[in-house]
Design a protein with these regions (language model features):
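Transmembrane alpha-helical segments of multi-pass membrane transport proteins and ion-pumping complexes
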Residues: 1-9, 28-32, 53-65, 85, ...
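Short helix-capping/hinge motifs at transmembrane helix termini and TM-loop junctions
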Residues: 11-12, 39, 68, 124
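Alpha-helical membrane segments and immediately flanking helix-loop junctions
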Residues: 15-44, 50-51, 55, 70-108
């Protein structure tokens, strides 16, 4: 969310555009509700969430290799929190522990994003 705030300030996004992008790293079902509640454009939020998931799925394993992340728990949490359900599919390909941790991180990220997005929505 901090990245979205900085990008919004740099590119002078409106409040509506800003809150549209806030829920980019949670599942579509939760993200749609957050975007709608904060006054964002739900259809764009859905597209951004899907793009985030696909991009995270494509580069997630590569990023773990670059930064020498070998721990199964860390890989799962990274993929789940960054690329949500699509990342969890990738994590399950890597292993059972990665998949379990990815699923758990989706839930935790969802709850934290719902709470923090209310606070972050006030910044712009």
């Amino acid at each position: 969310m901090g990245c979205v705030l900085v990008m919004s300030l740099v590119f002078h996004l409106s409040h509506e555009e800003y809150v549209t992008l806030l829920p980019k790293s949670i599942t579509t079902a939760i993200g749609m509700g957050v975007s709608e509640e904060l006054g964002g454009i739900v259809t764009i939020t859905v597209a951004v969430i899907i793009i985030t998931g696909v991009f995270g799925n494509i580069i997630g394993e590569f990023v773990c290799k670059i930064f020498h992340i070998t721990d199964s728990v860390a890989k799962g949490i990274a993929l789940g929190s960054a690329a949500h359900a699509i990342g969890t599919a990738k994590a399950l390909e890597l292993g059972e522990v990665e998949g379990a941790m990815s699923g758990l991180s989706i839930a935790v990220s969802g709850v934290l994003t719902v709470i923090l997005s209310i606070l972050f929505a006030q910044f712009l």
